[in-house]
């Protein structure tokens, strides 16, 4: 009975202790939260918010790992992203409550020092602390080491900075600590010390005697070849990284040989000439792996000198020129080498035909080297023990040699990204390579039979990628049953693929399936989900699947990514998707025909990416999305639907949400006050019905890059607090009712694109254009800006698009505008600019540079990214701070859009069309003088509009040089002379007008492009003649009463009024004089005239009496009576 009570007590204690973290550690985490910032100035974690509300047990909180036995916190992952946040001081006392802490990760935290008496040395009170990561924190390394050396329990220490980091020691440092003797890190096994640019290994002596050190990372420093003799103080050293140092010339082998336990040595990105032995003929027997390359001037000499590494198994020689014929002969002497890695290195054409003598070779890896030619049928085919061949992304052509089938030990083969061709079933190569586990032949010109029967004898195949080839039908072998079970299968973007291979019906262990970009039709193959219960990602976008999407009958615990975008799926989004796929990380159902509401259970606890854009979804957004209640939701796109209601609420709390796209819906309501204080990087809420004022940002936001609130009903001022968005690149608030002026502090922001057109903004541009050196697009059209265009416009050195039309600007066009070498589109139309045209305008749009045409934060590169995505998601819990992954996943397609009038219409340019578009519109101003001949130098211009001005003189003959021009409008000016005949050479001209000028002579011949212009292009010029005009040359011109329409409307009106007054007075006087003369000369006429006047008087009298006076009297008497 006593034993039972004891066991019950033990069980109770285990349940109490293990079921939930310790209260003191829970409180310590909450206190720590307010001190640990990410680099954007926001809280790195939200333990007090979402995590505390959903998980009482802090062991389930983000970035926290607890012991399964004790419930104590053993790991804190507080790694931040790479940003520009303000530095902060470390406080060791915040970490002391975690008594069992083993791993503390604080990389990229921008720690610049520590508060008094709270340095890292105080962490020695944590007896179990084994690993500390402080990489990318700008602390002086000497001071840092002198503090860390007291933590005697450390086994792994990671330090490092970017190579451009400079150091300054804060006043809080105790500089005398350097001279104090600390306990030393006698247990340290691994030390990282990167990027400090040091050249003296003695700096590490502050850590004491590191006799147990096995791994030392010293890349990106300034060590020279003498470093090897200094490393003898680490007798246990096995792994040494000295990449990107200053090790030049000949390296003394004896110093390396003294490192008797060294097994791995990385010397890449140095400038080594050879490994020399000056004393004796000693060999280094311990070294197994050697990494070289990148900048060696004599690679063959270096390889020849490697014979002293007598036990070398692996040799890496990356990003080098290995085209010397002697390379292969030098490699033959390395008889022990089994692994060759030549990534990014170009090899001699005789390399593959002569490598057969390296019979011990097991791995030959030579991707991305630009090697070309055909694959030889000798040499490399004699490597009978070869297990791995990687020829990825070279330029090999031709067919596969038959001798490839001799490599029967081959397990891993990559031929992707070449120009190989042929029917892969035309010979027996694949039937002989039955040891294959990994095969990638994607992105070639192979003909791949749909049956895949050439692999019928394979039993070990788990990875197969045949994408970007041509699929051919072979009905003879459609029903074979495979002996292998694939884990990865990709058949994406193949020519002529209209149905899935039948062997997939017998696959039950797939993890990754990529079938996107084909012509697959019919219902979505849900049977693939039913059969493969361990499927982690299915990628079926860009096909023609139709019908509703059905969920599998059983729960899929492993599915993490589903992409069925750009198909023809219809119906409603399935209910309870988060229950069917509880571990789902990414869901993309965009560009389909889905309708109905968004189900409330679509967002699971792990959901990271949700894209439902470009469908027909309606109704309101469910509450869990409206407040962004998912703890991991990083990317939410609901664009181009029929959604309505208030997407934002007071409970809006995006924990890690970085990309939010709500554009082109019917959302309404006000923007929340905390929208700029969130984790957002991109917010696109354009083309909705949002109202109210733009909220201010009360403190610095170092994360928001792109803000688009265009085409809503926002009003009020642009808040000054918007200047707290310290890294914003895109500001788009066009087509609202914003008034007032642009805050002057905006010029201090790193903006690249400003779109504020069609508002009610005013003031002078001088307060706006100041120091926008990064600006690419400035669109302020249709506002009330007044005053001159400031001379400071010349400082906008990167400006590509200047759009200031329909304002109240006046004055000259400043010549400083000609300093903008990247300027390609200029629209200053419908202002009050006057003065002559600057001749230097002719040198704009000459050099077409690659403008940044999109607000792209990340780029999409599918190849390998989906597999990497799943693997990375599994291995790393806190993905939202990693830009490395996202660079392979997302394409933020918020493009720069520029509206410009040409060919008598207004067009919106974007993408590559915008990149090549160039034009100048100065119409509807008061410009005077002649057109400068220099404007004919703009050989790349596509549109030029100078209409409705006061320009005079002749049309320059140099306009015949405008070979790319498509629209030329010179109408409504005062131009004279003839139309240059050379304009007939403008073969791209589609719209041409010189109407309403004073031109004379014959119009250009009615041929080529000028054969498409009718008389409206020339009307209003009475002295022009020739077809298509009515005036024939040699005859008197038919004058038009509208022959000289001036471009300055106010001046034209004044002249017309003067002519009217003069004509009216003369005509009226002539009539009076004629009437008086007639009455004087003829008495009958005079008597009749007076009778008519008398009768007219009586008629008016009685008319007034009967129709006005009598009715008024009658109503008055009636009221009185």
Swiss-Prot record:
It is found in: Cell membrane; Cell surface. Residues 1080-1121 are cytoplasmic. One of its GO terms (biological process) is cell surface pattern recognition receptor signaling pathway. Residues 21-1058 are extracellular. Glycans are attached at residues 91, 224, 298, 321, 333, 372, 406, 531, 576, 588, 689, 771, 822, 937, 945, 976, 998, 1014, 1041. Keywords: Cell membrane, Glycoprotein, Immunity, Leucine-rich repeat, Membrane, Plant defense, Repeat, Signal, Transmembrane, Transmembrane helix. One of its GO terms (cellular component) is plasma membrane. LRR repeats lie at residues 98-122, 126-152, 185-209, 210-233, 234-259, 260-282, 284-308, 309-331, 334-360, 383-406, 407-432, 433-457, 459-479, 507-531, 556-580, 581-605, 607-628, 630-654, 655-678, 680-701, 702-725, 726-749, 751-772, 773-796, 797-820, 822-846, 914-938, 939-961, 962-986, 988-1012. It comes from the Eukaryota. Pfam families: LRR_1, LRR_8. SMART domains: LRR_TYP. It is a single-pass membrane protein. Its main location: membrane. InterPro entries: Leu-rich_rpt (IPR001611), Leu-rich_rpt_typical-subtyp (IPR003591), LRR_dom_sf (IPR032675), RLP_Defense_Trigger (IPR051502). The chain crosses the membrane at residues 1059-1079. Residues 1-20 form the signal peptide. Involved in plant defense. Contributes to resistance against parasitic plant C.reflexa. Acts as a receptor for the 11 kDa glycine-rich protein (GRP) of C.reflexa inducing immune responses such as emission of stress-related phytohormone ethylene, reactive oxygen species (ROS) release, and hypersensitive cell death. Recognizes a specific pathogen-associated molecular pattern (PAMP), a cysteine-rich peptide 21 (crip21), from GRP located on the cell wall of C.reflexa. Belongs to the RLP family. Interacts with an 11 kDa glycine-rich protein (GRP) of C.reflexa. Interacts with SOBIR1 and SOBIR1-like kinases; presence or absence of GRP has no effect on interaction. This is Cuscuta receptor 1. It comes from Solanum lycopersicum (Tomato).
